[in-house]
Amino acid sequence: MSYYAFEGLIPVVHPDAFVHPSAVLIGDVIVGAGVYIGPLASLRGDYGRLILEAGSNLQDGCIMHGYCDTDTIVHENGHIGHGAILHGCVVGRDALVGMNSVIMDGAVIGEESIVAAMSFVKAGFQGEARQLLVGSPARVLRQVTDQELYWKRLNTKEYQDLAIRCRTGLSETKPLTQVEENRPRLKGTTDVKPKSAQ
């Protein structure tokens, strides 16, 4: 694991969280219970405080950072998709930030909201609960439906379960040189499907 103290501040990681060995946590970072942090995530707590609350996830290649005297927060069960950037913002409880989205300083994503993939949320945006945000710059398209929120929660549950699975089932290894006969497929825990398959 890549943990670095910075000017006396040491990252805090709950023992029930999973942090991939290639992720980097620097300084003022606080990671709650059941959190999943994916490969190559960068959490630079060298200016502002970075907080991932219980049950949230920060997937592969995500970046968290913020200015001095600010908190960048992903609240409980927040879901941050691959490659997203969070800078000095707040992501509400049970909200989802889609892949490769950018959330800027002082922005607040309301609880149970969804930010569509590739969206850009401008600095200072103040969201409300259950908003679907789309575009660059992001605009409120409509309210999140019950079906969309259910789908989001299933995906978040998958990552909460993945944190548990990775703590016991992930190990560094050498690759095989050929595909074995009857190679098994991995399964999730919730049977969640991509939105395109619904």
UniProtKB/Swiss-Prot annotation:
Region (Disordered): 179-198
Position of the signal peptide: none
GO biological process: carnitine metabolic process
Record-level Gene Ontology MF annotations: transferase activity
Pathway field: Amine and polyamine metabolism; carnitine metabolism
Residue stretches of biased makeup (Basic and acidic residues): 180-198
CDD domains given in the database record: LbH_paaY_like
Keywords on record: Repeat, Transferase
InterPro entries named in the record: CaiE, Hexapep, Transf_Hexapept/Carb_Anhydrase, Trimer_LpxA-like_sf
Keyword Transferase: yes
Coiled-coil residues: none
Job of this protein: Overproduction of CaiE stimulates the activity of CaiB and CaiD.
PANTHER family associated with the record: DYNACTIN SUBUNIT P25 (PTHR13061), GAMMA CARBONIC ANHYDRASE-LIKE 1, MITOCHONDRIAL-RELATED (PTHR13061:SF29)
Family that this chain belongs to: Belongs to the transferase hexapeptide repeat family.
Protein name: Carnitine operon protein CaiE
Lineage: Bacteria, Pseudomonadati, Pseudomonadota, Gammaproteobacteria, Enterobacterales
